[in-house]
């Protein structure tokens, strides 16, 4: 058997390399394996109108993503044979490059929030960003998160107290945001004043104030005027105690509040006083009492609630915890090494003060921090050489983490400055809007009171002359909005003076009250850019009763609306959607001004029973609302 195989093997090898055919006939052609067209198909990706082309194999390298899985078929359009994505095409370029090269980069000019949204949509995680861009991406993302947190805190601080807030929530909100109420602001400044008084008293009581009768030695002020300082300390501690108890009672989580750093500072600031009350003045506990009095100096840390700079410093130290830990570890190693070397280098000198390695720690610390008090100096040549090396190494070790700490402090400081600037700009912008709308509304009401607006709108020439006298296009558009609201609703804008007079007349005389001249009540004006609706009753938003009842007033701003029944003009839908040429010209001459067309189903003139709508001869004093200036 083995001999037969050995004889056949050379022929098989020869046939394998093509020297000798094994079969007498020609070998059949191998079956041609047709490659699927879908494997090398060219895919067109339409991203907001921008076309991108790539191979299907390129996308299928990452099947866990949106483009690499079958989920992309949900975005396929058979008509155009494209995959359409309504996303940002600029960021998509970098995402498509990731499929091509396997490296994801972060574009520095793009918004970090938009970039994260695009990555999340296409199923990519930020951790795959290349090393060349990852650090900058993390920094930008951290800054954006801090900025969003500051904005959220600002919005929370600026919100007014909700009616559903409990007393506990109101007290905590007053402590955290003192500018929310007058009482909270007063308590904020009172506590700050007593903190300053307590710190100053703790310093002044150690100053010599002369000798008292019967004593030759000068006594400190704290002993000579013990009663006065005790009363002052008692008043400060009482304020601090009340503040701490109120914070503890109003805290959302008392357990977290007790464990917080500021809570520990508050306890340490007031605890020595209460311990001193129960301790006697014997000599056994005098040393412990003096030690407790030292802790009163920690009251100065309470200023961190009143100083933004101290809070920034605390945030900086917290963010640089790893760098500070590295600095402490490096200094500890260097101190131990150089203290040991200095001890053995000075061991042979009889006048040496390096009596032990722990005693050499003091010299090493002073030398590495470049202080050099001179109380301990090396005597030998070897000691002086190692002392010089110790001084140089201290400069290097301390200087390494300093730039990181400074950069973090600068970043946090400028971030707080930008947040303060944004808050100030937001307040100023809202104030300008309120002032502009309030001034425009007052001017509108003044024109109505004087009868100028209705007279000048009778003709096109007078209207254009009136518009030319307007202060700004904003005021013109605001007047036009108020005019359209009068024409499309059964409301009339009146000022507070007319509103009060009308209410008094309704209360005393049961007859229709006269109202101020209104554009909607003038004769001869039958068509405007907005036609008027005719309603029987209405409901005030956020009101508990219907607008037809008396006494329901929704206060929003200083402009009043009086509900009166008028003869309806044209209530057809065609008049509401009429073109600009079919209407009276607007009270503005700019060609780019658009018109707000109100297309709301108009109620029928008759009731479902077929009766005519009853006309009310008088208006209700409660059908008055106030229109917000914002």
Swiss-Prot record:
Detected in ovary, in corpus luteum and in granulosa and theca cells in the follicle (at protein level). Highly expressed throughout the brain. Detected in amygdala, caudate nucleus, cerebellum, hippocampus, substantia nigra and thalamus. Expression is not detectable or very low in heart, kidney, liver, lung, pancreas and skeletal muscle. Not detectable in human heart atrium. Residues 308-321 are annotated as: S4-S5 linker. Changing residue 403 to A: Loss of channel activity. Residues 474-630 are annotated as: Important for normal channel activation and inactivation, for interaction with KCNIP2, and probably other family members as well. Residues 2-20 are annotated as: Interaction with KCNIP1, KCNIP2, and other family members. The chain crosses the membrane at residues 185-206, 227-249, 257-281, 288-307, 322-345, 381-403. Keywords: Autism, Autism spectrum disorder, Cell junction, Cell membrane, Cell projection, Disease variant, Epilepsy, Ion channel, Ion transport, Membrane, Metal-binding, Phosphoprotein, Postsynaptic cell membrane, Potassium, Potassium channel, Potassium transport, Synapse, Transmembrane, Transmembrane helix, Transport, Voltage-gated channel, Zinc. Changing residue 320 to S: Increases peak current amplitude and slows the onset of inactivation at low voltage, but has no effect on the voltage-dependence of activation. It comes from the Eukaryota. It catalyses: K(+)(in) = K(+)(out). Phosphorylation at Ser-438 in response to MAPK activation is increased in stimulated dendrites. Interaction with KCNIP2 and DPP6 propomtes phosphorylation by PKA at Ser-552. Phosphorylation at Ser-552 has no effect on interaction with KCNIP3, but is required for the regulation of channel activity by KCNIP3. Phosphorylation at Ser-552 leads to KCND2 internalization. Phosphorylated by MAPK in response to signaling via the metabotropic glutamate receptor GRM5. Phosphorylation at Ser-616 is required for the down-regulation of neuronal A-type currents in response to signaling via GRM5. GO terms for biological process: action potential; cellular response to hypoxia; chemical synaptic transmission; locomotor rhythm; membrane repolarization; muscle contraction; neuronal action potential; potassium ion transmembrane transport. The transmembrane segment S4 functions as a voltage-sensor and is characterized by a series of positively charged amino acids at every third position. Channel opening and closing is effected by a conformation change that affects the position and orientation of the voltage-sensor paddle formed by S3 and S4 within the membrane. A transmembrane electric field that is positive inside would push the positively charged S4 segment outwards, thereby opening the pore, while a field that is negative inside would pull the S4 segment inwards and close the pore. The N-terminal cytoplasmic region can mediate N-type inactivation by physically blocking the channel. This probably does not happen in vivo, where the N-terminal region mediates interaction with regulatory subunits, such as KCNIP1 and KCNIP2. The zinc binding sites in the N-terminal domain are important for tetramerization and assembly of a functional channel complex. The channel undergoes closed-state inactivation, where conformation changes lead to inactivation through an intermediate state involving breakdown of its 4-fold symmetry. The transient neuronal A-type potassium current called I(SA) is triggered at membrane potentials that are below the threshold for action potentials. It inactivates rapidly and recovers rapidly from inactivation. It regulates the firing of action potentials and plays a role in synaptic integration and plasticity. Potassium channels containing KCND2 account for about 80% of the neuronal A-type potassium current. In contrast, the potassium channel responsible for the cardiac I(to) current differs between species; it is mediated by KCND2 in rodents. Is specifically and reversibly inhibited by the scorpion toxin Ts8 (AC P69940). Homotetramer or heterotetramer with KCND1 or KCND3. Associates with the regulatory subunits KCNIP2, KCNIP3 and KCNIP4. Interacts with the regulatory subunit KCNIP1; this interaction mediates the capture of both the N- and C-terminus of KCND2, preventing N-type inactivation and stabilizing the S6 conformation, thereby accelerating closed state inactivation and recovery. In vivo, probably exists as heteromeric complex containing variable proportions of KCND1, KCND2, KCND3, KCNIP1, KCNIP2, KCNIP3, KCNIP4, DPP6 and DPP10. Voltage-gated potassium channel that mediates transmembrane potassium transport in excitable membranes, primarily in the brain. Mediates the major part of the dendritic A-type current I(SA) in brain neurons. This current is activated at membrane potentials that are below the threshold for action potentials. This is A-type voltage-gated potassium channel KCND2. It comes from Homo sapiens.
């Amino acid at each position: 058997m083995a001999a037969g195989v050995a004889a056949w093997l050379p022929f098989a090898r020869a046939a394998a390399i093509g020297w000798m055919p094994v079969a007498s006939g020609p070998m059949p052609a191998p079956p041609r394996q047709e490659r699927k067209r879908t494997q090398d198909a060219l895919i067109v990706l339409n991203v907001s109108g921008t076309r991108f082309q790539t191979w299907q194999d390129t996308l299928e390298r990452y099947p866990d993503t949106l483009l690499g899985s079958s989920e992309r078929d949900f975005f396929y359009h058979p008509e155009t044979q494209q995959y359409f994505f309504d996303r940002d095409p600029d960021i998509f370029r970098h995402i498509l490059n990731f499929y091509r090269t396997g490296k994801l980069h972060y574009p520095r000019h793009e918004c970090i929030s938009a970039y994260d949204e695009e990555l999340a949509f296409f199923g990519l995680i930020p951790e795959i960003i290349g090393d060349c861009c990852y650090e900058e991406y993390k920094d930008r993302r951290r800054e954006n998160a801090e900025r969003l947190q500051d904005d959220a805190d600002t919005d929370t601080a600026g919100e007014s107290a909700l009616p559903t807030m409990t007393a506990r929530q109101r007290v905590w909100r007053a402590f955290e945001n003192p500018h929310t109420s007058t009482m909270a602001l007063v308590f904020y400044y009172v506590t700050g004043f007593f903190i300053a008084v307590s710190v100053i008293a703790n310093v002044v009581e150690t100053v010599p104030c002369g000798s008292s009768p019967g004593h030759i030695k000068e006594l400190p002020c704290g002993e000579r005027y013990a009663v006065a300082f005790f009363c002052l300390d008692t008043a400060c501690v009482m304020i601090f105690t009340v503040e701490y108890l109120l914070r503890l009672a109003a805290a959302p989580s008392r357990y977290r509040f007790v464990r917080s750093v500021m809570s520990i500072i508050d306890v340490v600031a007031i605890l020595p006083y209460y311990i001193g009350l129960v301790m006697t003045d014997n000599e056994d506990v005098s040393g412990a009492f003096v030690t407790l009095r030292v802790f009163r100096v920690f009251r100065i840390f309470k200023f961190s609630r009143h100083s933004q700079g101290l809070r920034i410093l605390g945030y900086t130290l917290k963010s640089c915890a790893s760098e500070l830990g590295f600095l402490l570890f490096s200094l500890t190693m260097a101190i131990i090494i150089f203290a040991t070397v200095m001890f053995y280098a000075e061991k042979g000198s009889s006048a040496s003060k390096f009596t032990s390695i722990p005693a050499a720690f003091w010299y090493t610390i002073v030398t590495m921090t470049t202080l050099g008090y001179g109380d301990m100096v090396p005597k030998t040549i070897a000691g002086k050489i190692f002392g010089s090396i110790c001084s140089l190494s201290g400069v290097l070790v301390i200087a390494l983490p300093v730039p990181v700490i400074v950069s973090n402090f600068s970043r946090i400081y400028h971030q707080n400055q930008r947040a303060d600037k944004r808050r100030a700009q937001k307040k100023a912008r809202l104030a300008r809007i309120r002032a502009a709308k309030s001034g425009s509304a007052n001017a509108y009401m003044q024109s109505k009171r004087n009868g100028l607006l209705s007279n000048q709108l009778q003709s096109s020439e007078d209207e254009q002359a009136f518009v030319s006298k307007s202060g700004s296009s904003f005021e013109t558009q605001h007047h036009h909005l108020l005019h359209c609201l009068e024409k499309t609703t059964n409301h009339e804008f009146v000022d507070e003076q007319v509103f009060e007079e009308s209410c008094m007349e309704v209360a005393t005389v049961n007859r229709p009250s006269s109202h101020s001249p209104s554009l909607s009540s003038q004769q001869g004006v039958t068509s405007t850019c907005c036609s008027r609706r005719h309603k029987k009753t209405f409901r005030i938003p956020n009101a508990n009763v219907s607008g037809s009842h008396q006494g329901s007033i929704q206060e929003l701003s200083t402009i009043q609306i009086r509900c009166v029944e008028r003869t309806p003009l044209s209530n057809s839908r065609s008049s509401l959607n009429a073109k600009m040429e079919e209407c009276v010209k607007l009270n503005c001459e700019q060609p780019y001004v658009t018109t707000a067309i109100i297309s709301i189903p108009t109620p029928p003139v008759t009731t479902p029973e077929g009766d005519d709508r009853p006309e009310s001869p008088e208006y209700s004093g409660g059908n008055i609302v106030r229109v917000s200036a914002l």
